UniProtKB/Swiss-Prot annotation:
The organism of origin for this protein: Deinococcus geothermalis (strain DSM 11300 / CIP 105573 / AG-3a)
Role summary: Binds to the 23S rRNA.
PROSITE patterns assigned to the protein according to its UniProt record, in alphabetical order: RIBOSOMAL_L9 (PS00651)
Keywords: Ribonucleoprotein, Ribosomal protein, RNA-binding, rRNA-binding
Entry GO MF terms: rRNA binding; structural constituent of ribosome
GO BP annotations, alphabetical order: translation
Pfam families, sorted: Ribosomal_L9_C (PF03948), Ribosomal_L9_N (PF01281)
Family note: Belongs to the bacterial ribosomal protein bL9 family.
Domain of life: Bacteria
Name of the gene this protein is made from: rplI
Protein name per Swiss-Prot or TrEMBL: Large ribosomal subunit protein bL9
Length: 146
């Protein structure tokens, strides 16, 4: 029996059409909401959902590329309390996100990639992953507060 997977799992990813034994489909997959029968109407609905998902992904990628063009070459400068080259505490993803917010860029702190923990004054290479296919390199400049 052919079913359309509604949730990712052992059988495949969401939207895949897979062959399973009829009893497994009737008694487990369909009642649990993991799959739906592969009827003509369900296939049309699936195709419409796939098209809508593709359009959404293209929109998200275009937005990420627009953000990349605006963020290109931006240096994030942070003033932190420090003593003898070492800073008190560490520069976190949230600190970088706040600095970018002050510059007028609304970013998600969880998408900021920092190669290591920043605990010293200096210049660091960081990146912002705006989309799985779009990574924006930036400079982080940490200097002592005066």
């Amino acid at each position: 029996m052919q079913v359309i997977l509604l949730e990712p799992g052992r059988l495949g990813k969401t939207g895949d059409v897979v062959n399973v034994k009829p009893g497994y489909a009737r008694n487990w997959l369909i009642p649990q909401g993991i799959a739906a029968p592969a009827t003509a109407s369900n296939m049309k609905t699936l195709e419409a959902q796939v098209r809508a998902r593709k359009k959404q992904q293209e929109r998200e990628k275009a937005q990420a590329e627009d953000l990349a063009s605006r963020l290109n070459g931006v240096a994030v400068e942070l003033s932190v309390r420090a003593g003898e080259g070492k800073i008190y505490g560490a520069v976190t993803h949230a600190d970088v996100a706040d600095a970018l917010d002050k510059l007028g860029f609304d970013v998600d702190r969880r998408r900021i990639e920092m190669p290591k923990t920043v605990k010293e004054i200096g210049e660091y290479d960081i990146a912002y992953r705006a989309h799985p296919e779009v990574t924006i390199p930036m400079k982080l400049v940490v200097h002592a507060q005066k």
